[in-house]
Curated annotation (Swiss-Prot):
<dbReference type="InterPro" id="IPR009022">
    <property type="entry name" value="EFG_III"/>
</dbReference>
<feature type="binding site">
    <location>
        <begin position="19"/>
        <end position="26"/>
    </location>
    <ligand>
        <name>GTP</name>
    </ligand>
</feature>
<keyword id="KW-0963">Cytoplasm</keyword>
<dbReference type="InterPro" id="IPR047872">
    <property type="entry name" value="EFG_IV"/>
</dbReference>
<dbReference type="InterPro" id="IPR000795">
    <property type="entry name" value="T_Tr_GTP-bd_dom"/>
</dbReference>
<keyword id="KW-0251">Elongation factor</keyword>
<dbReference type="Pfam" id="PF22042">
    <property type="entry name" value="EF-G_D2"/>
</dbReference>
<dbReference type="InterPro" id="IPR014721">
    <property type="entry name" value="Ribsml_uS5_D2-typ_fold_subgr"/>
</dbReference>
<keyword id="KW-0547">Nucleotide-binding</keyword>
<dbReference type="GO" id="GO:0032790">
    <property type="term" value="P:ribosome disassembly"/>
</dbReference>
<keyword id="KW-0648">Protein biosynthesis</keyword>
<dbReference type="InterPro" id="IPR027417">
    <property type="entry name" value="P-loop_NTPase"/>
</dbReference>
<dbReference type="GO" id="GO:0005737">
    <property type="term" value="C:cytoplasm"/>
</dbReference>
<keyword id="KW-0342">GTP-binding</keyword>
<dbReference type="Pfam" id="PF00679">
    <property type="entry name" value="EFG_C"/>
</dbReference>
<dbReference type="InterPro" id="IPR004540">
    <property type="entry name" value="Transl_elong_EFG/EF2"/>
</dbReference>
<feature type="domain" description="tr-type G">
    <location>
        <begin position="10"/>
        <end position="285"/>
    </location>
</feature>
Length: 698
């Protein structure tokens, strides 16, 4: 028997809550769950019992790491909430959740306005075309400034954001909001945890200001809507419904961002923002079709939410759940799926059986018989599916483009304390790398040492912590190492010739390769320019393979060689002695021989670092950035503090948190995010080579 869909598609919202760390994102999500009847006790992040932050590490650090997907109900709408992390080290989680949600709420701290990580997540949301509304949170704090926060959206994000509300009071006197569309005031009763409020006419002392702001709002909407513009210029009355419809249309087109005010912690304004989610954010029917590819023909296929079409979904997160084991979070784009049925993992071309389907609520779950298009659910039983895989109807395979995964920039060695720990660690690392594609683990074949790499120190700290807590692995952690790279800066032609004659079958491979630098980020490219069969067809893939393998260990200090083009243009072979293996070796010799002539350099990751400090410490802070080989990119003022933008090599940033704390008496903060690779200065390059050589020579 077919199961019935509980909420129609137009009454479904898939949203993310995006913010800078500490802007109050988890508290905001908590309140949404509380007011939509999903939790009965409010948890505070800073007390460590928030409902969304369900991994122990998150509880300890009071930050949100994993995007848990939660289902809530507001009025007669279903809202699926993807909780996204606010810390830079977890940007992949944010990217991943942006892929599967249709709209987002950006939470700002009313004291700080737009902060560095807000800029990062905002840019990512632009990339994925996600419509947003903005919630200016923490209006109860001293120094809260709603207007300045709205202004920061224009100045720092170039966003056409406009208030649809005006706060009544701020800091201690913040008691509610005025709705500029319906021209009413929502005033809260302190004692009722925000679940009770009175909607009253706009108080007299706010009337004039509210009308002025309403007029500004209408003008802003008129700029993006011709219908409203015509009425406005003609002096005609614009109804509330017309205004809301125009705001919705412009918001869905990414031309307008409605701004709300509130205090999640003090339980004010969250319900009105929820109304905004329903009024202005898209349902799965409003978003532009999702583009997939037919693996057989390569043709593009547009997916619109429709339960009757063949099933297609994206696996966007793998989590290891203490109760049910391996849990795969999926977003369904078309069709429906019943528990117990088979799907095709089109990315791996393998059939998988879905055991059970769960609707997730932060850390409790409800089993459901079927999941429909536009929905988000957890699936149990998918053994081979990893993040970014496409799950489809076995008769209609499709590839839903996979996520772009950034390369890790930092590495540490992990040494298990005992043989038993070694076995447990292997299992732990396999599980953790499955869950998080930006986390890598590899064993150095020469030293037998295990190296883990990730997006920052916090990222690796948390992974090590999880190994200990979830898998009982006791391990010693080495000093963080930078993920250096190597590249060529000049063109160089070189021969690689491998000849071995010693009784029986010999070995013979001979190649001439022209190496040229490739554009940054383009990686390795191989070109076959052999004419007249001087290197037989069957050996050419071996040359390509030999180069790729040799490039993994670089030419200077054993770091991967990147961004190089290699053109195979000449060579020779021996009728009897030539083999694939011989040409592989010949290719690696050509690479070695080219290194000296090609101006090989070591590249280091350069981080975009933003430091916020009270003005009195500015000199010290700037001095410490310069001392770390940093280059200043500019400065701005923010809420009585100075914000310094700079680029600093990652190798110089270890331990910076401690330095900054002591030089600003704990008042300075910084964020850093990987920006680009750049050649290291000669002296530092020599040091790195010496250090690596010293290790290799032991």
């Amino acid at each position: 028997m077919a199961n019935k869909r509980e909420f129609p598609l137009d009454k479904t919202r898939n949203i993310g809550i995006m913010a800078h760390i500490d802007a109050g994102k988890t508290t905001t999500t908590e309140r949404i769950l509380y007011y939509t009847g999903k939790i009965h006790k409010i948890g505070e992040t800073h007390e460590g019992d928030s409902q969304m932050d369900w991994m122990d590490e998150e509880k300890e650090r009071g930050i949100t790491i994993t995007s848990a997907a939660t289902t809530a109900q507001w009025k007669d709408y279903r809202i699926n909430i993807i909780d996204t992390p606010g810390h830079v080290d977890f940007t992949i989680e944010v990217e991943r959740s942006l892929r599967v949600l249709d709209g987002a709420v950006t939470v700002l701290d009313a004291q700080a306005g737009v902060e560095p990580q807000t800029e990062n997540v905002w840019r990512q949301a632009e990339t994925y075309g996600v419509p947003r509304i903005v919630f200016v949170n923490k209006m109860d704090k001293i120094g809260a400034d709603f207007d300045k926060s709205v202004k920061s959206l224009h100045e720092r994000l170039n966003a056409n954001a406009h208030a649809v509300q005006m706060p009544i009071g701020s800091a201690d006197t913040f008691e509610g909001v005025i709705d500029l569309i319906n021209m009413v005031a929502d005033v809260y009763d302190e004692d009722k945890l925000g679940s009770k409020w009175d909607t009253i006419p706009v108080p007299d002392e706010y009337k004039e200001e509210a009308l002025k702001r309403r007029n500004e709002l209408i003008e802003a909407v008129a700029d993006v809507d011709d219908g409203i513009m015509d009425k406005y210029l003609g002096g005609e009355e614009i109804s509330n419904d017309e205004l809301k419809a125009a705001i919705r249309k412009a918001t869905l087109n990414l031309e307008f961002f409605p701004v709300y005010a509130g205090s999640a912690f003090k339980n004010k304004g969250v319900q009105m923002m929820l109304d905004g989610v329903i009024d202005y954010l898209p349902s799965p029917l409003d978003v532009k079709p999702y583009v997939a590819h037919d693996p057989k023909t390569g043709d593009e296929v547009e997916l619109m939410a429709d339960d009757k079409k063949p099933f297609a979904a994206l696996a966007f997160k793998i989590a290891t759940d203490p109760f049910v084991g391996r849990l795969t979070f999926i977003r369904v784009y078309t069709g429906s799926l019943q528990s117990g049925s088979y799907v095709l993992n089109a990315s791996k071309n393998a059939r998988e059986r879905v055991g059970r389907l769960l609707q997730m609520h932060a850390n409790s779950r409800t089993e459901i018989p079927e999941v429909f298009s536009g929905d988000i659910a957890g699936a149990i039983g998918l053994k081979n599916t990893t993040t970014g895989d496409s799950l489809t109807d076995p008769d209609h395979p499709l590839i839903l483009e996979s996520l772009q995964v950034p390369d890790p920039v930092i590495q540490v060695s992990v040494e298990p304390k005992s043989k038993a720990d070694r076995d447990k660690m292997d299992v732990a690392l396999q599980k953790l790398t499955e869950e998080d594609p930006t986390f890598r683990a590899e064993t150095n074949p020469e030293t037998g040492q295990t190296l883990i790499s990730g997006m920052g120190e916090l990222h690796l700290d948390i992974m090590v912590e999880r190994m200990k807590r979830e898998f009982n692995v006791e391990a010693t952690i080495g000093e963080p190492q930078v993920a250096y790279r190597e590249t060529f800066t000049k063109e160089a032609k070189a021969q690689g010739k491998f000849v071995r004659q010693s009784g029986g079958k010999g070995q013979y491979g001979d190649v001439w390769i022209d190496f040229t630098p490739n554009e940054e980020g383009k990686g390795y490219e191989f070109e076959d320019a052999i004419v007249g069969g001087v290197v037989p067809r069957e050996f050419i893939p071996s040359v390509d393979q030999g180069l790729q393998e040799a490039m993994k260990n670089g030419v200077l200090a054993g770091y991967p060689l990147i961004d190089v083009k290699a053109k195979l243009y000449d060579g020779s072979y021996h009728e009897v002695d030539s083999s694939e293996a011989a040409f592989k070796v010949a290719a690696s010799l050509a690479l070695r021989n080219a290194a000296a002539k090609a101006g090989a350099v070591i590249l280091e990751p350069i981080m975009k670092v933003q430091v916020t400090t009270p003005e009195e410490y500015l000199g010290d802070v700037m001095g410490s950035i310069t001392a770390r080989r940093g280059s200043m990119e500019g400065m701005e003022d923010r809420a009585g503090a100075k914000v310094i933008n700079s680029f600093v090599p990652l190798s110089e940033m270890f331990g910076y948190a401690t330095t900054l704390r002591s030089s600003t008496q704990g008042r300075g903060t910084f964020t850093m995010v990987f920006d680009h690779y750049s050649p290291t200065p000669k002296s530092i390059q020599a040091e790195i080579i010496k250090k690596r050589g010293g290790e290799d020579a032991e």
